[in-house]
Curated annotation (Swiss-Prot):
Residue stretches making up the Helicase ATP-binding domain: 39-195
Entries under Pfam families matching the protein: Herpes_ori_bp
Function per UniProt: Probably involved in DNA replication. Binds the origin of replication (ori).
Name this polypeptide is given: Replication origin-binding protein
Top-level taxonomic group: Viruses
Species the sequence originates in: Human herpesvirus 6A (strain Uganda-1102) (HHV-6 variant A)
GO molecular function, one term: DNA replication origin binding
Lineage: Viruses, Duplodnaviria, Heunggongvirae, Peploviricota, Herviviricetes
Keywords: ATP-binding, DNA replication, DNA-binding, Nucleotide-binding
Positions that bind ATP: 52-59
Entry-linked Gene3D superfamilies: P-loop containing nucleotide triphosphate hydrolases
Length: 780
């Protein structure tokens, strides 16, 4: 029973499908609505929790309810997104609810208006409690507590709980509302009656749809792009969702090259936030990413088909976000959705473990037991987050769901299973190469294998260097003049504050030998979030290495990094925050990561965690993994949402099943402790510092590349090896002799880190001193 529970109900438990067979607390009354849209008629309980699919009339029922609320009662609606809040206000206004105000239209810092629509991140601005509280898309609201944009987590959490406690009427709605939400309300307000409305009605505009999963992108009649081309040749209007900007740009270029006369609209984060979709009817193809999500709905009967390109990638949108974005087009004429998953970026033989398997009828008991063990291990590591001081009750209560969402991104089988479950729950039929869902395991595994074998890389666009001058060129040029606050050289402008900003950054964070021009190059790289994350981890690890107390590190981190502003360009018209990094971590997780990184650095005898010059012996790697594997696997899950089990769990049968679920080649050899140790350390360095741990041969001189050996170096080495160098006069002759002699001597395998050694530039922080004055002198 434990195996079945773990395998069959992990997703249903956390994404709402299990509400039909749960025993709820005594103050919860369950209402079932199956044949009609959501309705609050005859539901008298003051707290109403609604689980209903997209297109089931939740918003319509809400508007009807609000029209009956006495005017003297105050009403607050909390949304998960600013665009969603604006769309709700628009719908309210169209339906006669004209006394609501949008929080971003209120100029006063403190909000005490009687009827307000507010986005969750701005909840701390509210000064009053409200009689009626509306939580539309409550799971998305809770999800925002994990967003990097949630800068006042504690204040928002406290206000959120206060609003629930003091409101006389609460309505919370979501398509994936879970029993944990019900239990939270029941425990938080035990003396209040609660109605759980389970509405299973789905309008025909969703229930008649079929989602066709394509196993290839190119290459055959029913491939993803072949179907798209066929639709366009018939002059069909298409909507295409892409999970990443890279995929969206790729599809945009591909469609434009094949169909140059078609009008194609591209909507990604590079074009800015999408606040309106009314203009879509002017285009033949609309390509959008998750910038179009909850709250924006395209209602006209215009698009014939919906295409979905999912590029699975660490840090990309999870399957719930994908599912929500798919539902933005409310009416599809041909009632078909074509979905392609590209797993090329998560293809790996590292021992990543899935956490669930689809409910195929023919899984063996052994296979179910393997996944059950993985699921139990996953839950155990996630529960380790208890030790951290979460500043949010909501984050603590719902962290499992967030870990599931983020962990499944790097698992092909988990992502496919979860997306299919969400589609089926919304009464959208699933077709995987002619098979419904769920299906026989061999069909499922075969589909995964073809996906992996036929997947393709998307080449990133390379931006060729233009005519723009570098910081150093502008400052050094004799033709540069001072024009007001700007240094000017032809069309090139550089604000004087940029020099000051670079000087301050250099003095605060960088080593004495780093000049202001290198500092400018580093700041340019830090515009990339992944580079910022590495910088933060390096800085923290160096603090630990210098023996700084964790409380002092936290203080300086908050003062110098978390809110440190850097210019996006020479013009200093826009700034970004150095501490603007995504993740599910708390401060305690970051500092634990830094302490673990320092212990690993010492074990491997590295100068830093980005040291590219030191050879790492295999013995040191194995000893480090033996000492630190438990801590590494815990941090990998809690900080990086990467699920790896302990070595003892990886039997040959386990590896074979995991590789099948990844669509990879079946393993025939033994998975040794050496391979496991190298794998987990490779994952750690890649996730924490973007460094690649690779096998190599020992360097001739530690810390010195072969190509940099001098004639004297080579002569000394040959003498030490007792190799005659008679008649060896030139460097070429010495190098050849050294190479031949080393073949018999260099049999040992060593490892080294490859990547950018940013640690060389980051300052030692033992006393948190500054190495230079904030500015530089620039002659005119």
């Amino acid at each position: 029973m434990e195996n079945r529970f773990q395998n069959d109900t992990l997703f249903s438990e956390w994404f709402g499908q299990s509400l039909s067979d749960v025993r709820f607390p005594d103050n919860v009354t369950v209402y079932s609505q199956a044949d009609s849209a959501v309705s609050f008629e005859n539901v008298r309980q003051p707290i109403k929790l609604v689980r209903a699919a997209m297109g089931s009339g939740k918003t319509t029922a809400l508007i009807h309810f609000l029209k009956q609320v006495p005017r003297e009662l105050s009403v607050l609606l909390i949304s998960c997104r600013k665009t969603f809040a604006a769309e709700i206000l628009h719908r309210f206004t169209l339906n006669g609810l004209k006394d609501f105000e949008l929080y971003c239209d209120i100029t006063e810092r403190q909000i005490n208006n009687r009827k307000v629509i507010v986005q969750i991140e701005s909840l701390h601005r509210l000064t009053e409690n409200y009689d009626v509280l509306i939580l539309d898309e409550i799971m998305s609201i809770i999800k925002q507590f994990y967003s990097k944009t949630m800068t006042k987590t504690k204040e928002v959490d406290c206000k959120f709980l206060s609003l629930i406690k003091n409101s006389s009427h609460v309505i919370a709605m979501d398509a994936t509302l879970t029993r944990h939400v019900v239990e939270f309300f029941a425990a938080f307000k035990p003396d209040t009656q609660i109605a759980l409305i389970r509405n299973t009605f789905v309008s025909a505009m969703f229930s008649n749809r079929i989602a066709y999963f394509c196993d290839t992108f190119f290459g055959k009649e029913f491939s993803f792009f072949a179907r798209l081309e066929d639709k366009l040749r018939w002059d069909k209007k298409l909507c295409l969702f892409c999970s990443t900007v890279l995929a969206a740009e790729y599809m945009y270029d591909l469609i434009r090259s094949r169909f140059p006369l078609k009008k194609v609209l591209l909507l990604t984060s590079k074009q800015g936030k999408c606040s309106s979709i009314e203009s879509w009817i002017r285009y033949d193809v609309v390509i959008y990413t998750s910038v179009v999500t909850v709250g924006l709905s395209f209602e006209p009967v215009y698009f014939s088909s919906l295409f979905v390109y999912i590029q699975l990638a660490k840090g990309g949108p999870d399957m719930v976000s994908v599912f929500q974005s798919i539902g933005r087009v409310r009416r599809v004429i041909d009632e078909d959705i074509y979905i392609y998953m590209n797993p090329v970026l998560i293809r790996s033989y590292d021992p990543l473990a899935p956490i669930a398997i689809p409910p195929c009828s023919d899984w063996s008991v052994a296979e179910q037991s393997i996944i059950s063990e993985s699921c139990i291990d996953f839950r155990g590591k996630c529960s380790g987050a208890h030790k951290y001081n979460f500043c949010s009750v909501l984050k603590s209560l719902f962290r499992y769901r967030h870990y599931i969402e983020k962990t499944t991104i790097t698992s092909l089988s988990d992502s496919l299973f979860l997306l299919c479950s969400l589609l089926c729950e919304n009464s959208i039929k699933v077709d995987i190469v002619g098979n419904g869902f769920p299906m026989r395991k061999e069909v499922f595994l075969s589909f995964l294998q073809i996906l992996v074998e036929e997947c393709h890389f998307i080449e990133k666009k390379i931006t060729l260097p233009g005519d723009d001058m570098t910081f150093q060129e502008i400052i050094s040029s004799r033709e540069t003049i001072m024009n007001g606050d700007f240094y000017e050289n032809g069309d090139q402008l550089l604000h004087k504050d940029y020099i000051t900003d670079m000087g301050k950054f250099r003095a605060t964070f960088l080593s004495p030998g780093v000049d202001i021009f290198i500092a400018s190059d580093i700041v340019y790289d830090l515009k990339n979030e992944s580079k910022r994350y590495v910088f933060v981890n390096v800085w923290l690890q160096k603090c630990v290495s210098a023996g700084v107390e964790s409380t002092e590190i936290e203080r300086v981190f908050c003062e110098r990094i978390k809110c440190y502003m850097l210019p996006k360009s020479f013009l200093c018209d826009e700034y970004f925050v150095l501490g603007d990094i995504s993740g599910v971590y708390e401060w305690g997780m970051l500092i634990d990561l830094a302490f673990l990184a320092e212990m690993i650095r010492k074990d491997l005898k590295l100068k830093s965690c980005t040291d590219t010059t030191t050879d790492i012996s295999e013995d040191d790697l194995l000893l480090c993994a033996a000492r630190r594997s438990s801590d590494i696997l815990q941090i990998m899950q809690l900080v990086f949402t990467v699920h790896v089990q302990f070595f003892q769990k990886y039997s040959l049968q386990t590896l074979q099943l995991f590789n099948k679920l990844r669509g990879m080649r079946i393993v025939t050899g033994v998975f040794s402790i050496e391979k496991f140790s190298i794998s987990i350390l490779r994952l750690f360095f890649k996730c924490a510092f973007n460094m690649t741990l690779s096998a190599s041969r020992p360097r001739y001189i530690p810390g010195k590349a072969y190509r940099n050996l001098t004639k004297n170096d080579m002569e000394n080495m040959l003498d030490n090896w007792e190799i005659s160098r008679t008649n060896l006069k030139t460097c070429k002759e010495l190098r050849k002799a050294l190479t031949e002699a080393s073949r018999a001597r260099r049999k040992q395998t060593i490892y080294k880190l490859q990547g950018s050694d940013i640690s060389l530039s980051v300052s030692e922080v033992g006393v948190f001193g500054q190495h230079a004055s904030p500015g530089v002198c620039v002659s005119s």
